[in-house]
Amino acid sequence: MRLHELYPFAEERASRKRVGRGSGSGLGCTSGKGNKGQNARAGGGVRPGFEGGQMPLQRRLPKRGFKNAPFKATYEVINLDRLVASFEGKTDITLEDIYARGLCKAGASVKILGVGEVSVALTVEAHKFSASAAEKIRNAGGEAKALEG
């Protein structure tokens, strides 16, 4: 028997609470929700952070610092092994080729990562390269062209 095969005995496992099935069950009538009020209703309760109409904490505290999220540069990553498998027999790989093969969305910024091996001399165009990817491409006799933008 292994650690992930351990389980409690059937009589030790708590049975599921079945509410609203008669007063003899102990959870009939109001089904553990108390008497009346917003929380007793279907779909009742308040959203997280709601303080009953009082100005909530996240609005009472001042904003601090600079939020760069809208301007954050995001890249779609492609590993070398996937790139080599998709372009077998081709030595010049441009961004348009990558978009055309469906390796990433058209117009996306592309970063090449160094997972996998390169045996042929490739000329690869992308917005960014990891250090290991650029090194592997150069060691195979190829060229890693980093584009602007």
Swiss-Prot record:
It holds the Pfam family Ribosomal_L27A. One of its GO terms (cellular component) is cytosolic large ribosomal subunit. One of its GO terms (molecular function) is rRNA binding. Residues 21-35, 42-52 have a biased composition (Gly residues). Keywords: Ribonucleoprotein, Ribosomal protein, RNA-binding, rRNA-binding. Coiled coil: none annotated. It comes from the Bacteria. The keyword rRNA-binding applies. SUPFAM superfamilies: Ribosomal proteins L15p and L18e. One of its GO terms (biological process) is translation. The keyword Transport does not apply. Residues 14-63 are annotated as: Disordered. Binds to the 23S rRNA. Part of the 50S ribosomal subunit. Belongs to the universal ribosomal protein uL15 family. NCBIfam families: rplO_bact (TIGR01071). This is Large ribosomal subunit protein uL15. The gene is rplO.
